[in-house]
């Protein structure tokens, strides 16, 4: 078959309304009609000439912003204003039991990913020729490199929309802020012994597939404001190049906040690009976003994407605070300076004995008189969820000649090193204990010890506060996130420009960090099972995930109120690479299933045709979105009894026999027929029906359960989430 070509013209349209405004449009022109590039360009000019009215206007509107997309699609003409995305920012693999200690485990089966190619769309990496030069300058500290097969950059969309503003970014594939380097090293970094960050977290750093190759596509750019942005056009182009280059897996650690765009809209460049990648058999792993813990904040929600939440791991950085009454409080920090011996401890507050005003809120410490802070350890409280609050509080105390700061805040946020200054985090409970001690004595004092590294018990696993949560705001019947992985204080390589750079490494937190963990594992699964579809691989990791942490304890979800985690926090659970390699059954899907999904949720025939490059006419009546063959069941509006169909494919022993185990959501009846699935050499696929009936008589929130198919060896678990809605489309706030 002749490879088709999407021709995407990035056109400059000037809207004359007092001032000229530059806009960017992605125009899909369908299959290429000419092999000669000059003929192709001339056909674009002819089209624009007919629209704009003159040959000169057509030429000016397109030059030089022309991108040729090479993936096999056949789009109807459409256009959309450019959308920008945000980047979603050593112990991990041991915690996940993803090691090479057993001779038959997935790392050894795949030779640690040798010959695999993981495509990373990000800010690229410190490698290739730029890496060689930097290594000469900075020595061996950059050894946590990845094996690069190519790197490219796309910045047409960014340049057109934002212009070539003065900023420190490299207009080349070289990484500026370290985000892409960190992501690539997490997915496929080589073994680097005796790695640490400020002396903490010491061990051997490596990626999930340490011998895999990385193909980097730079579509994200550091701006003069300090932010990093990724244009939709650059993302689509980068994904298209990755498809053309033949990557095995794509890892994309960016997204945007609600409200989300429809999956068929080119403004959702990730969803559109990912669809074409998945159609070519390339799994796409995406960060779920950092807008948690609020519900309905999950991004990258298309059902063909593997969407990843972030958890902590069984490692912490305890820092001991000893009060003058010999009570020791254990905070968290990244402090590796000297001991701070017993020093005056203060909480700035009005006592009524002074005409001065004092401020105990962390954001207002700089407003305090200098003598209140000078040569003291300061306690403050904040409601902020940003790690930058700790940095700012430390900076303010330093300027006022203080000796340290203890920040009381909601738990679950990223730690900051505060550049060698002792800044410690405690929760409100411990902060209140310290405050009561201060108020109980005329001469409160405290001493601070350097941070230690604690690994294993009793450190528990939690879904990170920042990790975006479901349910899915576009299609509530599609469970998102799909899976969770460690994404808090992940130690990996970075750029020297990284604010938190330390000898080539940094600790970063975000779903940006958890997504490449899963991407590395997905690459290995594709090596073990090269004929599995992206949907089968997604099913394998969802149905075999840990729903307790590796020590067997329940997983909690951090937030304003810590609670037991549910599928909207972590999808199927925490990824388990060994079990995913041998799941027993998979819930498989292909492009036809995704087209049925698009029809079921009400997209028009023309918009679906534009996405899938194939004329599509949806059936009437529409199929049910509940029947999409996902490894989950999510019913957002149950009022009457519904029956749902799923199909499983046996990828285990030929003669397997499975029976269901049902854990029904509270107040909901769930039955499965047939009650046994019997596979043989001629029957690899079997369907079953799930009947769901609510006993509730009022609108409820979601209740959770599970459906497990078991053959006594494999336990194939899918989450079940049900919300009763007697009154449909009802916003419940009473």
From Swiss-Prot:
Propeptide: 20-88
GO cellular component, one term: extracellular region
Domain of life the protein comes from: Eukaryota
Biological processes, Gene Ontology terms: proteolysis
Domain Peptidase S8 as annotated: residue spans: 92-581
Entry keyword annotation includes Hydrolase: yes
Coiled coil: none
Alphabetic keyword roster: Autocatalytic cleavage, Glycoprotein, Hydrolase, Protease, Secreted, Serine protease, Signal, Zymogen
Subcellular location: Secreted
Glycosylation site residues: 108, 143, 326, 355, 497, 669
Cross-referenced PANTHER family: PROPROTEIN CONVERTASE SUBTILISIN/KEXIN
Domain PA: from-to ranges: 361-438
Gene3D superfamilies reported for this sequence: 2.60.40.2310, 3.50.30.30, Peptidase S8 propeptide/proteinase inhibitor I9, Peptidase S8/S53 domain
Protein name according to UniProt: Subtilisin-like protease SBT3.2
The keyword Protease appears for this protein: yes
Signal sequence, renumbered to the chain: 1-19
